[in-house]
């Protein structure tokens, strides 16, 4: 018994040392811009952008192969933050950032069979429900990646515009020329 425990411990320590040495030897340095972009992205790795996770999108943006608006779950705020980094440091053209309406999944409960394929596929656990029971989406947790829509066998899930609440609604900042012109006409 003691010999088995000692041999397993020695084997574990030896393999751990080999893994640590291999990690140091084969370490690949990532550019700092990729790390900056990855910090801004939501980190849900949903794949809605078409890249394998948020790090894949960050690498593509750093190389100039992906637009700053590729991350749909991040929305307008993430696109604006990425535009500042990518255009200044990578020299990529950000282009105009269109107003992206945040989307959420919606389940038609009369079509849902409770197969749980959407439940298993959701990266943020925004879908609730049990086996052979009707599922529903928690709108505050849904990021709009559409991963659940792809796997639904009965097409009971659709993507809808997220309803505006006091948390999500905002006014655009007024343009400086318009404010000055309206002040002059008022006087």
Curated annotation (Swiss-Prot):
Any one Gene Ontology BP term: electron transport chain
Keywords: 4Fe-4S, Electron transport, Iron, Iron-sulfur, Membrane, Metal-binding, Nitrogen fixation, Repeat, Translocase, Transport
GO molecular function: 4 iron, 4 sulfur cluster binding; electron transfer activity; metal ion binding
Binding of [4Fe-4S] cluster 2, residues: 112, 115, 118, 152
Principal subcellular localization: membrane
Source organism superkingdom: Bacteria
Induction of its expression: Expression is reduced under iron-limiting conditions.
Enzyme Commission no: 7.-.-.-
Enzyme class per UniProt: translocase
Domain 4Fe-4S ferredoxin-type: 103-132, 133-162
Family: Belongs to the 4Fe4S bacterial-type ferredoxin family. RnfB subfamily.
Protein's UniProt name: Ion-translocating oxidoreductase complex subunit B
Originating organism: Rhodobacter capsulatus
Lineage of the species this protein comes from: Bacteria, Pseudomonadati, Pseudomonadota, Alphaproteobacteria, Rhodobacterales
